[in-house]
């Protein structure tokens, strides 16, 4: 997703958090809306560090993240389990750490929500906060003078803080590209020059002279390729880097703002150790040598082991959470309402008749869900994977190489699809079609066809469909064709190349596009599509705010109007079709019904909370998500 999508989504999460409140049990509002509660009532971490407080007690610092964003830093006493939450001391707007560092002076630093922040565990307090240019650090390091450096997404912002003097320098955005940049590594040589490596559309390594603010490239334009560059600080005082991380050889020695090609990495180029990392940072070792064996935020359990004695100690801790945001909602063949959350990655099953929840750690992020026959299918991020779940059998969890797992791993489609936006369960009962945007730094997404009878896949690339486009929405037509709606958005960190989105018709048998056209001028995304059996027309939303009606026979728009924004998620599910063929629309703040003759959007109700993900029908109700909560709406009689 591009920067505009991310910024809007982070703001929206903050609004949803305020509307939903905490982990509310099932409750009804005015007889129409029911809040069924939180799908996954726990948080995930965005960095964990084992360290000590001012009394030399072992403590654990955990950045807590739920559907609101990174809302607090949790401090756990490793001996007693006693915990304390320190609310994030600035308006984070749904953002979260993507990098943190514990300095040599035992201070925890991060940079997110356009704020650089320091936490001092000896004082048990946030001790420095400074607003910066947007937005969040993708890498952080410490130089030989104890200065903390950060490099931020999406426009290569560089910031530095000297804890000894209190001086903070925001160098601003120091490198421009027309795509969102991920500076995933940063290093400083012993001469004080700062080097940072970016990706994904075109890798690069740049150097900053902190004395003058000068920024200069370390590799030629001809050496820049799709992927992520890499730099690290060595114990010999120099920095080493690669134009593309992981390549054999091709190393550069970087020193005093110059680059020298050295081929293989020199034997004396040993990485200098820092307690730093991405959002997955998990530093397990305490200063006294004890180690974290387990930290489980779902079970609220901490296990610490002593390698010297082999003994371990288990303590329970607690914290507040509003739960992970729901990515997808659909009705399963067993009559339950199911979907997935992120973050953390959990699958949920809700039985409305018994008012009972089941929750399972799941494989990846469930962007798109759909049922076909007696199975429930999942299209997920990362890798554009496809899962098959039998809800009538015991849940075992997913292992890629286990054909008996439930859910069962079927296949994946990276790099052509990395982040799914549509999973079409075709009415033929055997075909599944997955669509979405491609891998990081790529432009143009494919289509994955899965044949359940033969258990085989066909993967089309964007060049087989529409070059530089990705498919955002799909609907099956009765003549053996698919109508697809594209997005011009590239894969995360990629470059947008198509000028406007298009509709296309694809013949399923031949897998060939037989027609395409940018039918609505200037549109960047066809958010969702729905076929109405009553009139043979297709309803759609373009850029979330333009409702249109398309005639697949004449290939023309027969109606269009501007509306309030429709509900939105990576797999939107804006339209909900009832068994009697009535078609409903989920807007962010209301629910409407489409008149099949006049195409009027008849308002049914204003929603008490924002709708963040659709949407399915069960027993006279429409189920949808608002942040971390599952809601439903009782449909009035026609």
Q: For each predicted feature, which ranges?
A:
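Surface loop/turn motifs at the tips and blade-to-blade linkers of beta-strand repeat domains
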Residues: 35-43, 87-92, 129-133, 172-178, ...
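Repeated scaffold domains used in trafficking and secretory/extracellular systems
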Residues: 41-51, 93-101, 134-142, 179-186, ...
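Conserved beta-propeller blade signature
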Residues: 59-63, 107-110, 147-150, 194-197, ...
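Short, conserved, GDST-rich strand-edge loop motifs in beta-rich repeat architectures
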Residues: 65, 434-444, 484-500
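Residue-level signature of beta-propeller blades and closely related beta-rich strand-turn architectures
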Residues: 65-66, 114, 154, 200-201, ...
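A short loop-to-beta-strand structural motif that recurs across blades of beta-propeller domains
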Residues: 72-74, 115-117, 157-159, 204-206, ...
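Short loop/turn segments that connect beta-strands within beta-propeller blades
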Residues: 78-81, 120-124, 162-166, 209-213, ...
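Blade-level signature of beta-propeller repeat domains, shared across WD40, Kelch, NHL, RCC1
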Residues: 609-638
């Amino acid at each position: 997703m591009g920067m505009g999508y991310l910024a809007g989504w982070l703001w929206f999460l903050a609004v949803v958090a305020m509307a939903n409140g905490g982990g509310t049990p099932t409750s009804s509002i005015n007889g129409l809306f029911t809040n069924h509660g939180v799908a996954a009532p726990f948080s995930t971490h965005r960095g964990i560090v084992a360290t000590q407080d001012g009394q030399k007690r072992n403590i654990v610092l955990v950045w807590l993240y739920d559907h609101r964003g990174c809302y607090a830093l949790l401090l756990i006493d490793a001996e007693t389990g006693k915990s304390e939450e320190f609310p994030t001391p600035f308006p984070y707007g749904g953002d979260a750490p993507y990098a943190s560092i514990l300095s040599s002076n035992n201070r925890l630093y991060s940079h997110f929500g356009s704020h650089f922040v320091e936490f001092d565990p000896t004082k048990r307090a946030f001790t420095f906060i400074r607003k910066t240019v947007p937005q969040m650090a993708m890498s952080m390091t410490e130089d030989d003078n104890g200065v903390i450096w950060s490099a931020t997404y999406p426009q290569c912002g560089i910031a530095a803080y000297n804890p000894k003097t209190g001086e903070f320098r925001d160098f601003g955005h120091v490198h421009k590209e027309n795509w969102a940049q991920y500076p995933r590594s940063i290093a400083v040589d012993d001469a004080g020059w700062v080097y940072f490596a970016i990706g994904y559309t075109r890798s690069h390594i740049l150097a900053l002279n902190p004395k003058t603010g000068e920024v200069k490239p370390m590799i030629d334009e001809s050496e820049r390729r799709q992927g992520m560059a890499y730099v690290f600080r060595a114990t010999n005082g120099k920095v080493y880097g690669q134009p593309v991380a992981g390549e054999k050889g091709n190393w550069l020695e970087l020193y005093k703002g110059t680059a020298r090609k050295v081929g293989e990495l020199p034997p004396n180029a040993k990485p200098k150790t820092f307690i730093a990392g991405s959002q997955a940072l998990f530093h397990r070792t305490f200063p006294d040598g004890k180690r974290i064996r387990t930290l489980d935020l779902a079970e609220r359990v901490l296990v610490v082991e002593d390698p010297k004695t082999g003994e371990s100690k288990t303590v329970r801790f607690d914290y507040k959470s509003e739960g992970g945001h729901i990515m997808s909602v659909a009705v399963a063949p067993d009559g339950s309402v199911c979907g997935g959350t992120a973050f953390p990655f959990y699958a949920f099953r809700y039985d409305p008749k018994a008012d009972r929840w089941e929750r399972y750690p799941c494989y990846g992020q469930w962007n798109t869900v759909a049922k076909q026959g007696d199975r429930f299918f999942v299209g997920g991020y990362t890798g554009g994977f496809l899962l098959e779940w039998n809800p009538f059998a015991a849940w075992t969890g997913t292992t890629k190489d286990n054909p008996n797992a439930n859910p069962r791993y079927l296949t994946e489609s990276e790099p052509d699809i990395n982040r799914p936006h549509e999973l079409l369960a075709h009415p033929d009962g055997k075909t599944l079609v997955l669509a979405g945007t491609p891998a990081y730094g790529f432009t143009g997404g494919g289509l994955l066809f899965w044949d359940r009878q033969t258990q085989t896949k066909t993967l089309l690339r964007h060049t087989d469909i529409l070059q530089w486009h990705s498919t955002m929405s799909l609907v099956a037509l009765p003549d053996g064709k698919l109508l697809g709606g594209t997005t011009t958005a590239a894969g995360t960190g990629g470059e947008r190349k198509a000028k406007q989105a298009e509709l296309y018709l694809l013949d399923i048998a031949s897998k060939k596009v037989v027609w395409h056209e940018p039918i609505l001028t200037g549109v960047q995304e066809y958010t969702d599509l729905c076929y109405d059996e009553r009139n043979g027309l297709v309803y759609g939303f373009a850029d979330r705010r333009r409702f249109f009606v398309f005639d697949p026979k004449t290939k023309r728009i027969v109606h269009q109007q501007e509306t309030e924004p429709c509900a939105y998620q990576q797999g939107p599910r804006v339209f909900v079709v009832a068994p009697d063929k009535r078609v409903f629309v989920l807007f962010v703040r209301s629910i409407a019904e489409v008149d099949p003759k006049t195409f009027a959007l008849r308002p049914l109700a204003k929603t008490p909370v924002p709708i963040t993900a659709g949407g399915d029908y069960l027993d006279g109700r429409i189920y949808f998500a608002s942040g971390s909560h599952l809601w439903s709406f009782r449909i009035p009689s026609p």
